Amino acid sequence: LGTHVLLEAAKVHDVVRFVHVSTDEVYGEGESMETAPMIEDHVLEPTNPYAATKAAAEFLVKSYHRSFGLPVIITRGNNVYGPHQFPEKLIPKFTNQLARGRAVTLHGTGENTRNFLFVEDVARAFDCILHKAEIGKVYNIGGSNEQSNLAVAKQLIKIMGLEDQEASLISFVPDRAFNDLRYTIDNSALEALGWKELMPWEEGLKRTVEWYKTYSVRYANIEQALVAHPRIESAVSAI
């Protein structure tokens, strides 16, 4: 486990602060669209293997704080977006599909919602936590831009001037295994440190689209990232 290796190295070298980056997915699925934002002491109820491993890593990090006094801080972030993001992620994937004249591929109904936070706001949040956060505490890093995947697709189509083709540019495909309905987190602890979100959603989305329209050629081959369900080879089948 990579986290264990890093914790051991941090313990040996007496690091001043160990900031562990987790995810809002460890809280599990919001029961409805009216579910209150999750606060840091909410019980962890991960619903998929990725979230379960992130929760397990958190417990390991906390154990090093309690057992060895390692100065740890844990962050749980929502969806990050902005220039330079890998093309398999939602916004760059949709942008690159549209730029190539293809329909965006929406899992299920597309009504699943996520909060999005611009990468520059995320960077400032980490800087704030690194210098001001309390050792041993957990901090949510979330945006105020809750959007359904379908809404994001329609906004990208509009930004790219393709509104008259919207009906043909949205393709619904079978959903992913247990695709959580909603994640939403409370930022109060982070805001108490002096951080606040600065980038408006509309401006951040436009900046992101313009970057990918200009620089997506930097990725040598992104075709695999643009399919509806990227194939992951099984370790068992490879033996």
Region spans (language model):
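Active-site loop/turn elements of alpha/beta-hydrolase fold enzymes
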Residues: 23, 77, 109
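Conserved phosphate-binding and hydrolysis motifs of nucleotide-dependent enzymes
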Residues: 22, 50, 119
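Conserved active-site helix of classical SDR/Rossmann-fold NAD(P)-dependent CH-OH oxidoreductases
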Residues: 3-4, 55-62, 92-95, 123-124, ...
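Catalytic helix-loop patch of NAD(P)-dependent Rossmann-fold dehydrogenases
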Residues: 1-5, 12, 16-17, 26-74, ...
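Conserved active-site region of classical short-chain dehydrogenase/reductase
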Residues: 1-8, 88, 120-123, 127
